[in-house]
């Protein structure tokens, strides 16, 4: 089993548990240059809020889009957009990535902005 398939397997296991609980998820995806965050409905069919470093407004705020500072900006913005729609509590779906570095930075910024998980 290679590194990518192990990550996908971890993500599938976590998503299965969240689907059984029926909670709103804050899903992140990380690449070497960008980070993406989406708030997804419990049934998985609707994206309620989203933010990523690909957006022009966010990429203009940061010097480089693939670091912890950019992840913190994305976390803050996705939390603000979720709170605007009345979403206060979510389950954090890290998509099998380690809770470290940019993933941790995004989560901490979302918590500081008022999102609970």
From Swiss-Prot:
It holds the Pfam family Ribosomal_L18p. One of its GO terms (biological process) is translation. Keywords: Ribonucleoprotein, Ribosomal protein, RNA-binding, rRNA-binding. Disulfide bonds: none annotated. Transmembrane segments: none annotated. It comes from the Bacteria. GO terms for molecular function: 5S rRNA binding; structural constituent of ribosome. Belongs to the universal ribosomal protein uL18 family. Part of the 50S ribosomal subunit; part of the 5S rRNA/L5/L18/L25 subcomplex. Contacts the 5S and 23S rRNAs. This is one of the proteins that bind and probably mediate the attachment of the 5S RNA into the large ribosomal subunit, where it forms part of the central protuberance. NCBIfam families: L18_bact (TIGR00060). This is Large ribosomal subunit protein uL18. The gene is rplR.
């Amino acid at each position: 089993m290679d590194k990518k398939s192990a990550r996908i397997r971890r993500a599938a296991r976590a998503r299965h548990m969240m689907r059984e609980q029926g909670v709103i998820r804050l899903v992140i995806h990380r690449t070497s240059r960008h980070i993406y965050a989406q708030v997804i409905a419990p049934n998985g069919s609707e994206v309620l809020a989203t933010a990523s470093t690909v957006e022009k407004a966010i990429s203009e705020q940061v010097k480089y889009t693939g670091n912890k500072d950019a992840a913190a900006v994305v976390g803050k913005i996705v939390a603000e957009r979720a709170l605007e729609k009345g979403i206060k509590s979510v389950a954090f779906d890290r998509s099998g990535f380690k809770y470290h570095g940019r993933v941790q930075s995004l989560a901490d910024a979302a918590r500081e902005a008022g999102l609970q998980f």
